[in-house]
Amino acid sequence: MDRNKSFDPNLFKRVDINLLKRNDQLIGKPTTNSIEIIKRLFQNKWAILFFLLIVVIVLLAIIVPLTSPFSAVTPVSTNALAQNLPPRYLWHKPGDILVHKITARSIAEISQASGVLVGTLPSANSNPLATNVQYDIAPFQLQELRNYFPLLGTNGLGIDIWTLLWASVAKSLWIAVVVAIIAMVFGTIYGAVAGSFVGHMADNIMSRIIEIIDIVPSILWIIVLGATFRFGGVKQFDDSVVIFTLIFVFWTWPATTTRIYILKNKDTEYIQAAKTLGAHQIRIIFVHMLPVVFGRLAVVFVSLIPAVIGYEASLVFLGLKPATDIGLGALLNQVTSSDNVALILSSIVSFAVLTVAARTFANALNDAIDPRVVKR
């Protein structure tokens, strides 16, 4: 370097070193892997949105059935006029909402006596052979319904749809989560053991068992197992029968997924290093192998929830569960024979939102956990 070379001082500016960001001077506790995963997860705005949706759905499923003054299994009133009521809000007066009815003359005469009939009934002498009449009523003029404000109205049985909806979501979520947890625990352990002993007799036998179960259609397994339980004296599927049959059907999914990802990672450097250091096979499986596939297993777990709800619905359609039972499956079954817009939209939208939110959040969680994604 030429020491005699001159520099223009105007090209430089003094900077206080204390104002610089000095990473080498930062002192603090090292962050754990779980904290880093949470940070990466909530940097995804879609993950935050759908996580909040799931939280809202779960909270409503817990709070609404507990706080609602109405039951999810009994009508709001014994009066036939309480069936298929439209929504009513605080600004509606009792006489503001009219309902068009085509029903038996006897019921119409009851409504006339109740003081809720709008207009007059056709004379019996005008058509004495007529069994049905058309008329308009103001159902909220009934004394027992004057202070009733249904957010979504009532169904054909007179049950409050808002309460029924969230009680059904709670029941289906409870069954789905129980099935998913047990199927995941058993399937993950099964798949990890099979994958770590690949090439041995144990893996061959365990893999054949999975293939035998998977080759038979799932719905057939459900029917056969359900029929077996019914031979034991159970006339229809109760919750324990549903949970058992669905666990039997779905445990092979996480087992297969775990085995595949164990096979992909069993020859990696850190696994070979653990073997060289003398780590026990159980420690290698549960400490070194399984954490690598947690992201994919999270996707499988939340994907099981809408799948379980769908299969639960199929039990209602097959007549293996009573159509009057509480659950999203039974609620969706009611949609097929109803023209109640509130019932149709609420059941379909709730199922769709829950499914999309769960799958999207699972994919975001997989991206946050998977080390191959993090390194990109």
UniProtKB/Swiss-Prot annotation:
Keyword Electron transport: no
Function: Part of the ABC transporter complex OppABCDF involved in the uptake of oligopeptides. Probably responsible for the translocation of the substrate across the membrane.
UniProt keyword terms in alphabetical order: Cell membrane, Membrane, Peptide transport, Protein transport, Transmembrane, Transmembrane helix, Transport
Family from the record: Belongs to the binding-protein-dependent transport system permease family. OppBC subfamily.
Cellular compartment(s): Cell membrane
Domain ABC transmembrane type-1: 169-366
Gene coding for it: oppC
Example of a GO biological process term: peptide transport
Gene3D superfamilies cross-referenced by the UniProt entry: MetI-like
Membrane association type: Multi-pass membrane protein
Protein name: Oligopeptide transport system permease protein OppC
Assembly notes: The complex is composed of two ATP-binding proteins (OppD and OppF), two transmembrane proteins (OppB and OppC) and a solute-binding protein (OppA).
Membrane-spanning residues: 46-66, 149-169, 173-193, 209-229, 242-262, 297-317, 341-361
A cellular component term, taken from the record's GO annotations: plasma membrane
Species this protein is from: Mycoplasma genitalium (strain ATCC 33530 / DSM 19775 / NCTC 10195 / G37) (Mycoplasmoides genitalium)
Matching PANTHER family: OLIGOPEPTIDE TRANSPORT SYSTEM PERMEASE PROTEIN AMID, OLIGOPEPTIDE TRANSPORT SYSTEM PERMEASE PROTEIN APPC
GO molecular function: transmembrane transporter activity
Pfam families in the record: BPD_transp_1, OppC_N
Subcellular location, principal: membrane
